[in-house]
Regions:
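Gly/Ser/Thr-rich active-site loops/lids in small-molecule metabolic enzymes
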Residues: 170-175, 179-215
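ATP/NTP phosphate-donor binding region
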Residues: 1-65, 106-122, 131-141
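ATP/nucleoside-binding phosphotransfer catalytic cores, i.e., glycine-rich phosphate-binding loops
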Residues: 143, 149, 154, 165-168, ...
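Short, acidic/small-residue loops that bind anionic groups at enzyme active sites
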Residues: 85-103
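Short glycine/serine/threonine-rich phosphate/pyrophosphate-binding segments
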Residues: 15-16, 73-78, 186-191
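Catalytic core of DAGKc-family lipid kinases
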Residues: 97-175
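N-terminal glycine-rich "phosphate-gripper" loop used for MgATP/nucleotide binding
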Residues: 68-72, 80-81
Length: 287
């Protein structure tokens, strides 16, 4: 492996200390990495003059791997761009939880294993999310974790209808509904009372958020199902959909949010021999 991109979150990696160490380790292993920002920074933010940054959109088509430095949010953000190009992703945690990261910032020496091919690639299911208004598709995105349909007004509830393959699965009033992948089952979905699902499982997890109903329950559906969510006809409030914690899209009465398995899969690079349950136990001890 020779062509590698490093994408540090400048607000997490202060003075780029972690990425500087990674650059040296990779160079010593015979890899000449390119440095790119994962997103645009504030105009007033001054990048260090001794580091040369390239444009991500120019480098991504020619790379073999993206190494992302940050928390889970940064990794989720980069997963979309990398997946659309079919490029594997390796996360280095500089955040709090870092559930999706393969390495901690104290384990950078393991990056030298990339030069000798001592790694595996793990595929993760993604979801396609669209919003249809009348006959027009107004919103489309992919997600690795989840699509969240939620209320837009504090101290109010939103009434949502959820269907699987056109058949009513649940109708609930509350703060909203999470539609998650197995990867996303350990994120917001878990906080809302959803189950932990192994990432290799083929499921779509539907979890109500603070439902105002005694019988409200999570649904673990097959990944073959097409899930639709819309506000019920007597709803008096707007709702919003957000994908992997990104910018929210405002929903009107009559809009239909459709969530289904994507043909795209995120490829995560693994350098360590550990099970999913090892990760769960280790990460949640931090909380």
């Amino acid at each position: 492996m020779k062509n590698v991109i490093l994408t540090p979150n400048p607000y997490r990696d202060r003075n780029f200390q972690t990425v500087r160490s990674a650059i040296q380790i990779l160079k010593d292993a015979g890899i000449q990495p390119k440095l790119c920002l994962p997103f645009e920074v504030d105009r007033n933010y001054e990048l260090p003059k001794d580091l040369r940054f390239s444009r991500l959109d120019r480098e991504l088509p020619n790379t073999e791997l993206v190494i992302c430095f940050g928390g889970d949010g940064t990794i989720l953000h980069m997963a979309k761009a990398a997946t659309r190009r079919g490029v594997p992703l390796l996360g280095v945690n500089i955040g709090t939880m870092g559930f999706m990261a393969e390495l901690e910032s104290t384990e950078l020496e393991k990056l030298s294993m990339l030069a000798t091919g001592e790694f595996t690639t793990e595929k993760r299911m993604m979801l396609d999310v669209t919003v249809q208004r009348n006959r027009d598709i107004l919103f489309h995105d992919i997600c690795l974790n989840d699509a969240v349909i939620t209320k837009g007004v504090i101290a109010r509830i939103v009434h949502l209808s959820v269907k699987c393959d056109g058949v009513q699965a649940m109708e609930c009033g509350g703060d909203g509904v999470i539609v998650a992948t197995p990867t996303g089952s350990t994120a917001y979905c878990l906080s809302a009372g959803g189950p932990i699902v192994e990432p290799e499982a083929n499921n779509i997890i539907i979890t109500p958020i603070c439902a105002h109903e005694v019988g409200s329950r999570c649904i673990v559906a097959s990944d073959r199902r097409v899930v639709t969510v819309e506000m019920v006809r007597n709803a008096r409030r707007n709702a919003y959909v957000s994908v992997d914690g990104g910018r929210a899209f405002r929903l009107n009465l009559g809009d239909v949010v459709t969530v289904q398995k994507s043909h795209l899969e995120t490829k995560l690079v693994r350098l360590k021999e550990r099970s999913f349950y090892d990760v769960v136990n280790a990460k949640f001890k931090k909380v």
